[in-house]
Curated annotation (Swiss-Prot):
HAMAP family named among the record's database cross-references: SecD_B (MF_01463_B)
Gene3D superfamilies in the cross-refs: 3.30.1360.200, 3.30.70.3400, Multidrug efflux transporter AcrB transmembrane domain
Similarity remark: Belongs to the SecD/SecF family. SecD subfamily.
GO molecular function, one term: protein-transporting ATPase activity
Function in brief: Part of the Sec protein translocase complex. Interacts with the SecYEG preprotein conducting channel. SecDF uses the proton motive force (PMF) to complete protein translocation after the ATP-dependent function of SecA.
Any one GO cellular component localisation term in the record: plasma membrane
Protein known as: Protein translocase subunit SecD
UniProt keyword annotations, A-Z: Cell inner membrane, Cell membrane, Membrane, Protein transport, Translocation, Transmembrane, Transmembrane helix, Transport
Alphabetical GO biological process terms: intracellular protein transmembrane transport; protein targeting; protein transport; protein transport by the Sec complex
UniProt subunit comment: Forms a complex with SecF. Part of the essential Sec protein translocation apparatus which comprises SecA, SecYEG and auxiliary proteins SecDF-YajC and YidC.
Entry annotated with the keyword Cell division: no
Matching PANTHER family: PROTEIN TRANSLOCASE SUBUNIT SECD (PTHR30081:SF1), PROTEIN-EXPORT MEMBRANE PROTEIN SEC (PTHR30081)
């Protein structure tokens, strides 16, 4: 029979609409300003900490909507941001460095909805407010470090093969020049280097020298590796800040964008994300005298660094290990001297290296070198800020026994410095130093204004479209308008379910555009029905031919739009991608509501009936 859906298809439409309504409902309830308290150094918040937090809030007359202890962390909800900010400061002051106190926005979704995993969709920076950092990776520092590591490896490899050389020094474009003591060994040296370092370009400027340069492939590989590893570390640092729904992505060849929606403590975020500090552990060269240091008569494998009092310390250039082997750290006080210290835990490889080193250099001094990159106020020819490397010996201790993965570092100035250093080491040392080249803060009030304007635009667009459809298509306009509302509900529900989908102002523009495109499909169908009626077909045949005949045109038009959205997503960033996501999802949903959804309603109202007139 014409214009009748089988039962399974009607049930499918009802099920999809019901699921869409269910997962879009959390967006009605919004979010509460909240303070989240979680433990550091492997600790978890417990009932004792909960009692302290409740006492702080009661003492300062700060009312809460709720306060719960769950999964080792405490979440306190407030009615306004003023109470939230004051509570955060008071709680942090009471609990100290043993716990992380972070500002957050907690969904106010009822428990019965949370049982289904329903949560509100994520809002972008322009809607929620927050901070956006554009960070640039200093590739020069990365390539200099790679150059130093290469030269250190070459010295060991040439000595192992008994190839004598007089000098290994830097050349332009991060190259290395090896001057051989014996010209007859050049062929052997080149063969060894090609075997061990196949990505290097080898040239022969003179009979007794070999010039090594980084190939284009090696440069690109170094750049990509530095960016990807920095992205991983920055994600860990954002986790330390306790920020949910952060956006961290690469932009271009050497830049990283970080968006922290809802973050109000921007100074702390900037301090943690932009910090470049790390540690190196080096053996002190006791054979270098003070006189040799003053005359700069140092062995090729050693260099001088200074402690905080300005005293020189001769260190071997080769680090025992660096911050990349540190998997955990915590700050505290030394039990004997009550001075600040940082406890460090190494990975298995780092633990083995440290164990062998402390065995080899038993009763000899080892230094802890603090390394940080700072803005020196100058810019290069491309206008980029020049970062200057600052190194400082913060501790020299005699190795008193063999140890491995766990040890303590002293020599830091204060508890605060120890805590910051611990946080950075725990999240990982940046492979390449970075600098914040742009910082943009959007206040909650501006975000709220954007939300209001976006909602108003969507509502006015919806009202205008519905008014036109009701006026022009009568009862079929009612059906199309109902499908239009369901379209928005399904889109909101899908955006709430999809991980990584974030609603922004361009996304709202995509929704408004989707409204028009959804109605456009119905206009094609309805006009085709009217045309079939004018051609003398019965009403049931006209409805059937109207939907079947218009399908190809609707599918082709929407397919090209989806392909365009995919291209926008692939080549665009941030706002452009947000627009592309909502547009592509909206178009796909509009095909369902405009074709299958309205057909189900039309079939229910008119299917199988003898009709003499159709209100269209």
């Amino acid at each position: 029979m014409l214009n009748r859906y089988p039962l399974w298809k009607n049930l499918m439409v009802i099920f999809i609409v019901a699921i869409g309504i269910l997962y879009s409902l959390p967006n009605i309830y919004g979010e509460d300003p909240a303070v989240q308290i979680s433990g550091t150094r492997g600790q978890e918040a417990n009932t004792s900490v909960l009692g302290q937090v409740q006492d702080v809030l009661k003492t300062n007359n700060l009312p809460t909507k709720s306060i719960v202890l769950e999964n080792g962390s405490i979440l306190a909800r407030f009615t306004n941001t003023d109470d939230q900010l004051l509570a955060k400061d008071k709680i942090a002051e009471r609990l100290g460095n043993n716990y992380t106190t972070a500002l957050n926005l907690a969904p106010a979704t009822p428990a019965w909805l949370s049982m289904f995993g329903a949560n509100p969709m994520k809002w972008g920076l322009d809607l929620r407010g927050g901070v956006r950092f554009l960070m640039e990776v200093d590739m020069n520092a990365t390539l200099v470090k790679r150059q130093e590591q290469l030269q250190d490896s070459l010295r060991g490899e040439l000595r192992k093969e008994k190839i004598q050389y007089t000098a290994i020094k830097n050349t332009e474009h991060f190259g290395t020049l090896i001057t051989l003591a014996n010209v007859s060994q050049r062929a052997k040296a080149e063969r060894i280097i090609r075997q061990l370092h196949p990505t290097l370009d080898i040239t022969e400027p003179d009979a007794d020298s070999i010039n090594l340069g980084l190939s284009t492939a090696a440069l690109n590989e170094a750049r990509d590796l530095a960016i990807e590893q920095n992205l991983t570390i920055l994600r860990k640092r954002v986790a330390e800040l306790g920020v949910a729904e952060a956006v961290i992505q690469r932009q271009g060849a050497e830049r990283i964008v970080i968006e922290l929606p809802g973050v109000q403590d921007t100074a702390r975020a900037k301090e943690i994300l932009g910090a470049t500090a790390t540690l190196e552990f080096r053996i002190v060269n006791q054979n270098v005298t003070a006189d040799a240091i003053s005359r700069n008569m140092l062995p090729a494998d050693s260099e001088v660094k200074y402690d905080r009092q300005g005293h020189p310390v001769a260190l071997f250039k080769r680090a025992v290990l660096g911050g990349e082997h540190i998997i955990n750290s915590s700050s505290g006080l030394d039990q004997h001297s009550s001075t600040p210290q940082v406890s460090v835990t190494l990975d298995s490889e780092g633990g083995e290296i440290m164990s062998q080193t402390t065995k080899k250099y038993y009763k000899k001094p080892m230094a802890t070198l603090y390394v940080e990159y700072k803005d020196n106020g100058k810019k290069d020819e491309n206008g980029k800020t020049i970062l200057e490397k600052h190194e400082e010996v913060i501790n020299v201790a005699t190795i008193q026994g063999r140890f491995g993965s766990n040890f303590q570092i002293t020599g830091v100035d204060s508890i605060a410095e120890a805590h910051n250093l611990s946080t950075l080491l725990k999240s990982g040392a940046l492979i390449a130093p970075i600098q914040i080249v742009e910082e943009r803060t959007i206040g909650p009030s501006l975000g709220a204004q954007n939300v209001e304007q976006g909602i108003n635009a969507s509502l006015w667009g919806l009202v205008a479209v519905i008014a036109f459809m009701l006026f022009y298509y009568k009862m079929f306009g009612v059906i199309a308008s109902f499908a239009l509302v369901i379209n928005i509900v399904l889109l909101v529900g899908l955006m709430s379910i999809l991980p990584g989908a974030t609603l922004s102002m361009p996304g709202i523009a995509g929704i408004v555009l989707t409204l028009g495109m959804s109605v456009d499909a119905n206009v094609l169908i309805f006009e085709r029905i009217k045309e079939e009626i004018r051609n003398g077909r019965s009403i049931q045949q006209a409805i059937n031919e109207g939907y079947n005949g218009a399908f190809t045109s609707i599918f082709d038009a929407n397919l090209t739009t989806i392909l365009t959205a995919i291209i926008l997503y692939a080549v665009g960033t941030g706002p452009i991608q947000g627009f592309a996501i909502t547009l592509s999802l909206g178009v796909a949903i509009s095909m369902f509501t405009a074709i299958t959804g309205t057909r189900a309603l039309v079939n229910a109202l008119y299917g199988g009936k003898q009709l003499k007139k159709l209100l269209i």
